[in-house]
Curated annotation (Swiss-Prot):
Quaternary organization: Interacts with the U3 and U14 snoRNAs. Associates with pre-ribosomal complexes.
Gene3D superfamilies, per the entry: P-loop containing nucleotide triphosphate hydrolases
Superkingdom per UniProt: Eukaryota
GO molecular function: ATP binding; ATP hydrolysis activity; RNA binding; RNA helicase activity
Stretches assigned to the Helicase C-terminal domain: 270-424
Name recorded for this polypeptide: ATP-dependent RNA helicase dbp4
Keyword Phosphoprotein: yes
UniProt family annotation: Belongs to the DEAD box helicase family. DDX10/DBP4 subfamily.
Source species: Schizosaccharomyces pombe (strain 972 / ATCC 24843) (Fission yeast)
PTM-bearing positions, type Phosphoserine: 500, 503-504, 545
Enzyme Commission code: 3.6.4.13
InterPro entries: DEAD/DEAH_box_helicase_dom (IPR011545), Helicase_ATP-bd (IPR014001), Helicase_C-like (IPR001650), P-loop_NTPase (IPR027417), RNA-helicase_DEAD-box_CS (IPR000629), RNA_helicase_DEAD_Q_motif (IPR014014), SPB4-like_CTE (IPR025313)
UniProt short sequence motif DEAD box, positions renumbered to this chain: 192-195
Keywords: ATP-binding, Helicase, Hydrolase, Nucleotide-binding, Nucleus, Phosphoprotein, Ribosome biogenesis, RNA-binding, rRNA processing
Amino acid sequence: MPKNRTGRSREAREKKRKEEEEEIEELNSQIEALSETVDHFAELPLTQPTKSALKNAHFITLTEIQKQCIPSALKGRDILGAAKTGSGKTLAFIVPLIENLYRKKWTSLDGLGALVISPTRELAIQTFETLVKIGRLHSFSAGLIIGGNNYKEEKERLSRMNILVCTPGRLLQHIDQAVNFDTSGLQMLILDEADRILDMGFRTTLDAIVSSLPVHRQTMLFSATQTKSVKDLARLSLQNPDFISVHENDTSSTPSNLNQFYLTVPLTEKLDILFGFIRTHLKFKTIVFLSSCKQVRFVYETFRRMRPGISLLHLHGKQKQTTRTEVTAKFTSSRHVVLFCTDIVARGLDFPAVDWVIQLDAPEDVDTYIHRVGRTARYNRSGNALLLLLPSEEAFLKRLESKKIAVERINVKDGKKTSIRNQLQNLCFKDNDIKYIGQKAFISYLRSIYLQKDKDVFQLDKLPVEAFADSLGLPGTPKITFGKLKNHSQSQKDYNSSTSLDSSEESEVDVENKQNVRTKYDRIFERKNQDVLAAHRQRLVEVNSDEDDGDFLQVKRVDHDLPEETGERFNANSKRKEKMASSKKAMLKYKKSADKVYFDDEGNAIPFYAMNTEDTFQKAGDPAALIASHLAEERKALEKADITDKETVRQKQLEKKRRRQELERITQQDATPDEYVPEGPIVAFVDDELPETSKKQKKWFEDNDERDHGGIVEVENLNSLEDQEALALKLMGAA
């Protein structure tokens, strides 16, 4: 029997293997013959598990980028794809990734087969979720490695992964430190938002990653604003790539169903316009972009305290990864909410049903503008975008026209404007932390303007700095100095490449910082001024500023008119007298008794036990009238106290009655201590000594029947030694 079972199992495995080989051969032949574009996923030469997963996820019709990319990617060609935001680029590389590994018979023993690199953690998480949704019926193992997660757990599971979705910094860390991480068998490399990964912020990181990957592989690059630089393509070793740009000939670089507006507003009225917009759009889902983390936090904290009537969220790169994931999930599931964020949300993230995208601060270039407004009007859904420009930033409109982006000018009626300057001043006055955050937001905004590359648009010298500080509610203008940078051009590149996406992007700077590991004790001893604010806060405002009210406990008077001690100094002739003179207890008999005094409003000392003179007593009135009035006041006080005492006694009696009734009810129900354990005030009425119900546990050889057998021991069978020993123990127990 076992031989036949084994034979059938081997035959079944061989049959299944032949069927898979025949299926793969048929798929390869269909892919080679694929020439016409198809409109539905069911018409593509895909495996049945992939088709079922696509159908269950309600992916039926192909988008333009998917029609052109998927057939070429299935044939193993390198691809450079560009399409508008919200056009389905993620699915355009997820489907070929799964199918190509399946046709190559990739298993867990073959190691890493595909690598997907995303510039931000949130985009990597979203890509991984899509991968799991489409490939859940296949047997591949997939992993997500991003900054903020446990490095040791990732390192242990890394060798078993076939597909990895990652950020550049964490991937390079594993390549340098993980011994079991082998990339020699890599088949596919995919760069999502490739133009962002290829820029200066990830230059050394990407070069280090590519140098450890095999040259012969399939490479695919996707973005809404794609690069065609020969130098960048040579870095990635692309071999005759297919340039696919489905919207290159369109009249606009943004979706046609996106309504785009701009508003010219002074710097001092930006927050007023934003708060008024939120108050009038309570039934919408809105994203507000700002240029720095400090600005995001200041606007969120102040608006949250002013309660505009809608849920507020904030997201920036300085938050922990768990917080960022929770905020992203909450914003995705909410219908009416406002999200204040930096550019970590600008690329690739797919938030459903976003109605408005507001750019409170102008983007650094047109590509950033396209990615920002791409968070709305996705998948043929309508959306709205509003750009707030300063009068000195109107040159940015020419940059938009050069990329075929038309925006409509709107104006705000004076009657609709509401100033929140007084409220911001009140918040900064009451809360020192809000004032500190506002000062940091002020500095970070000016720093971002100073480090921008396009000086025709961003002009720091034309900004009303003092009026801007006043509009934030600050008591004074913080000091800010722009020192001479050693390498100004490099600093601009670093700022535009790394700070625009904050610390969420895993740039090479992050990787270098991770090499210098600090222990928990190092961080504890490095802490300063934990109970108030950071040490550098004092340098934000002029020390002699008359408007600064943040200092608590200031010296008002330096020299006091204190009476000087007169008299000769006591000179002791012996050590005993000197010791006695230094003893307070011994010197008390030489000092007069202390007088208890109190001070009036003018600071005059008045004896506490000063006796009234006869004149003052006569001025108070007739003694009999004083006695009568005093007795009347005391009588009223006693009557009030009597009412309170009666109510207290009444409540105690009611509580005692309630306890007694509760105890009677428990007694009537015949509740045992095992069934009911009284709690609260009832415990006082229950005896502490409760009868024990548990009995001594019987041994294995004792009879479970509690009835008396009268000393009779029943014997059934004594064939074994164990039975005889059991009988002897029973007889001994009966005796």
